[in-house]
């Protein structure tokens, strides 16, 4: 072990530590960070070399954060990244600084948004919040309105989690939906992600995702938002149902198949006649 440590440069150690952090299960960032900190035994090296991993983890996980003075949480995503550690809260039209290690928001300030698309963004946000409230009791959503490659684009992100460390499991749902505002019809693109970690009497992770493509009729803001939510609801319900059905199938078939019903000989042993078997005689003579 000592020889291995001598062979690893600081750069390699940080690279390995960063991978552990980025792949930390939902709700277990602090535990993984503390373990990596002990292994690396160099706080300055960890903070400076793995800072990008802290940020990437929060962006990938859609980490929700509460801003002092505002009621609702906002998600940390690449779509709200303003650079230099600042992020956008599109609903409240503010920017704020975010500490990726402490997961704290500070210094909220007014921030200009794209007025040309704000009415569309607001309509989708209103419909999306109602949907999330109905389907994800602990869920958070953030809706962005941005011009991308000259096209007015709506991006809706959803995050919902259950952290049950006392019961040895944690899980998180994430989904991202996007469409451009164009005459008549447009394409909706979505990606759904589930990640669950169970670690009582074992160590099992479920990591699953699904890409969605659908068409959306574009009319006025309110009606378009309503039709958009119908697509979201149908796709997410179908995905969650499929996950549940697959687990039931695995329970009924796959997991049972892991345990051999019969010995390799394909015949059951008659324990009452064990002495007549060769192995029984060998045991008797032992």
Swiss-Prot record:
Molecular functions per Gene Ontology:
actin filament binding
* Major localisation: cytoplasm
Q: Which PROSITE patterns match?
A: F_ACTIN_CAPPING_A_1, F_ACTIN_CAPPING_A_2
Tissue expression per record: Present in all tissues examined.
Keyword set, alphabetical order: Actin capping, Actin-binding, Cytoplasm
Got a GO cellular component term for this one?
Answer: cytosol
Q: Give the superkingdom in one word.
A: Eukaryota
Any one Pfam family here would be F-actin_cap_A
Q: Where in the cell is it found?
A: Cytoplasm, Myofibril, Sarcomere, Z line
The Gene Ontology biological process terms listed for this entry are: actin cytoskeleton organization; barbed-end actin filament capping
User: What SUPFAM superfamilies does its record include?
Assistant: Subunits of heterodimeric actin filament capping protein Capz
Family indicated by similarity: Belongs to the F-actin-capping protein alpha subunit family.
Q: How does it assemble?
A: Component of the F-actin capping complex, composed of a heterodimer of an alpha and a beta subunit. Component of the WASH complex.
State the protein's purpose.
Answer: F-actin-capping proteins bind in a Ca(2+)-independent manner to the fast growing ends of actin filaments (barbed end) thereby blocking the exchange of subunits at these ends. Unlike other capping proteins (such as gelsolin and severin), these proteins do not sever actin filaments. CapZ may mediate the attachment of the barbed ends of actin filaments to the Z-line.
Q: What protein name applies here?
A: F-actin-capping protein subunit alpha-2
**To which species is this protein native?**
Gallus gallus
């Amino acid at each position: 072990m000592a020889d291995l440590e001598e062979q690893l440069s600081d750069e390699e150690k940080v690279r390995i530590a960063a991978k552990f952090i980025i792949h930390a299960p939902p709700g277990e960032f602090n535990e993984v960070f503390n373990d990596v900190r002990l292994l690396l035994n160099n706080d300055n090296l960890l903070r400076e070399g793995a800072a990008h991993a802290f940020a990437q983890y929060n962006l990938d996980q859609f980490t929700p954060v509460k801003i002092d003075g505002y009621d609702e949480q906002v998600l940390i995503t690449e779509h709200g990244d303003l650079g230099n550690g600042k992020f956008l809260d599109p609903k409240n039209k503010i920017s704020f600084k975010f500490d990726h290690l402490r997961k704290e928001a500070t210094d909220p300030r007014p921030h200009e948004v794209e007025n040309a698309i704000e009415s569309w963004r607001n309509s989708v946000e209103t419909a999306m919040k109602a949907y999330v409230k109905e389907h994800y009791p602990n869920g958070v959503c953030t809706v962005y309105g941005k011009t991308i490659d000259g096209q007015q684009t709506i991006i809706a992100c959803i995050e919902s989690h259950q952290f049950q460390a006392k019961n040895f499991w944690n899980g998180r749902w994430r989904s991202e939906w996007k469409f451009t505002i164009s005459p008549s019809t447009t394409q909706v693109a979505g990606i759904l992600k589930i990640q669950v970690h169970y670690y009582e009497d074992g160590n099992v992770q479920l990591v699953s995702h699904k890409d969605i493509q659908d068409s959306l009729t574009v009319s006025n803001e309110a009606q378009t938002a309503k039709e958009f939510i119908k697509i979201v609801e149908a796709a997410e319900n179908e995905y969650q149902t499929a996950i549940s059905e697959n687990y039931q199938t695995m329970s009924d078939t796959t997991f049972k198949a892991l345990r051999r019903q019969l010995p390799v000989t394909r015949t059951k042993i008659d324990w009452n006649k064990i002495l007549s078997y060769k192995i029984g005689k060998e045991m008797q003579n032992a």
